[in-house]
Design a protein with these regions (language model features):
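Catalytic phosphate/metal-binding cores of nucleic-acid and nucleotide-processing enzymes, i.e., regions
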Residues: 2-116
Length: 116
């Protein structure tokens, strides 16, 4: 099995976010917001089109590609996710993690997403 090159990883990462979303995620990380975590507005929602898994993200460390948000796998939990791992994931059908194009940026809080 061929490993993913750095160029492929960057291209896959670009597919996860629109430029405006990436800028907003990084801006929120740089602000180091001290507000209640569950009241942070979600910038982007990622999902596994072939099974379980959604990630509602509020901020992104651009140096490490570690994002913060609500992960919904077996349980819903707040925490960090390595986007390099998400971009390298391929399902049994060869599908990768995708961005929910219809999710409204900065409209829902993490608490709203927990209730869904």
């Amino acid at each position: 099995m061929r490993s993913e090159t750095n160029k492929e990883r960057v291209n896959n990462m670009q597919k996860l976010f629109l430029n405006a979303q990436k800028k907003q995620l990084i801006k929120k990380y740089n602000l180091q917001q001290k507000e209640d975590q569950v009241n942070q507005k979600v910038v982007v929602k990622l999902f596994n089109p072939n099974g379980v898994g959604t990630w509602n993200l509020t901020e992104l460390n651009p140096n490490t590609n570690i994002a913060y948000g609500l992960s919904c796998l077996q349980e819903k939990e707040l925490g960090y996710v390595d986007l390099n791992e998400l971009t390298s994931f391929k399902s049994s059908l060869g599908l990768g993690i995708e961005r929910d194009a219809w999710f409204p940026m900065n409209k829902k809080t993490l608490e709203d997403c927990k209730q869904l």
